[in-house]
């Protein structure tokens, strides 16, 4: 079983993550069954978001009683500290847990930093100090924001689209993350369904140390 360590987080898991966006489209019973089946097959990293309707609720039920055996990453699209705390408390309640392993800013239009006026990064630091989150990450679709986040040294993980149809700029992001000891979580490994050869898609991702692909079951 191939394993991956997400940079300086120290999180080491099976090099297949579970993308929990699609489970919002199926029943609670089916979603819980699917998540538990993935767990039994050796998957330990599960990625969701506050914006994914009831995805967090479904994962919360799936891992109730075995929370310490999985890593859960979720996200907030908050624009200010007040929204951040509201989202975090809701996520913790939905997930039936008192901590999130990786709490990610969800595709912000800018790179949250201390003193930027949004209060977002300061809130994340406070949440980490309180033990409510363990690591601070960011997701994005913009190369400029992703690069700024890596070079800032403020983030422990980056989640970004990455597949075998990615170009040189995406490959450079992976290398930058490695240089900064930052975990790279690869979303859209099948490019939103454009790639149909899953074996080839995985073989591509497996070449890169520190890259964790998350797959969504459609």
What residue ranges belong to the model's regions?
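Active-site phosphate/pyrophosphate- and oxyanion-stabilizing loops and adjacent acidic/basic residues
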Residues: 57-61, 89, 147, 202-203
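Glycine/proline-rich, positively charged
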Residues: 26-29, 36, 79-193
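Short low-complexity, flexible loop/linker segments enriched in glycine and/or proline
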Residues: 61-63, 151-153, 173-175, 199-203
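N-terminal binding-site loop/beta-alpha segment at the start of enzyme catalytic domains
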Residues: 1-70
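Short beta->alpha linker loops
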Residues: 50, 54, 76-79, 140-144, ...
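N-terminal glycine-rich cofactor-binding segment that shapes the pocket for flavin-like pterin cofactors
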Residues: 65-76, 83
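Conserved short secondary-structure transition element at the edge of the structured enzyme core
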Residues: 39, 128, 152, 182-186, ...
């Amino acid at each position: 079983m191939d394993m991956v360590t997400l940079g300086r987080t120290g999180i080491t898991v099976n090099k297949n993550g579970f993308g929990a966006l699609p489970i919002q489209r199926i029943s609670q019973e089916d979603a819980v069954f699917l998540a538990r089946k993935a767990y039994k097959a050796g998957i330990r990293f599960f990625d969701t978001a506050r914006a994914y309707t009831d995805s967090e609720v479904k994962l919360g039920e799936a891992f109730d009683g075995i929370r310490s055996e999985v890593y859960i990453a979720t996200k907030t699209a908050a624009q200010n500290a007040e929204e951040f705390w509201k989202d975090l408390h809701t996520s913790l309640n939905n997930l039936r847990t008192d901590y999130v392993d990786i709490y990610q800013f969800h595709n912000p239009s800018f790179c949250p930093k201390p003193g930027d006026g949004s209060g977002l990064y300061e809130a994340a630091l406070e949440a980490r100090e309180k033990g409510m989150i363990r690591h601070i990450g960011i997701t994005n679709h913009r190369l400029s924001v992703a690069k700024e986040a890596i070079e800032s040294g403020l983030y422990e993980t980056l989640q970004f689209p990455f597949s075998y149809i990615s170009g040189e700029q995406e490959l450079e992001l992976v290398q930058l993350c490695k240089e900064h000891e930052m975990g790279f979580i690869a979303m859209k490994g099948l490019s939103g369904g454009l790639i149909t050869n899953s074996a080839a898609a995985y073989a591509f991702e497996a070449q890169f140390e520190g890259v964790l692909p998350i797959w969504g079951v459609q």
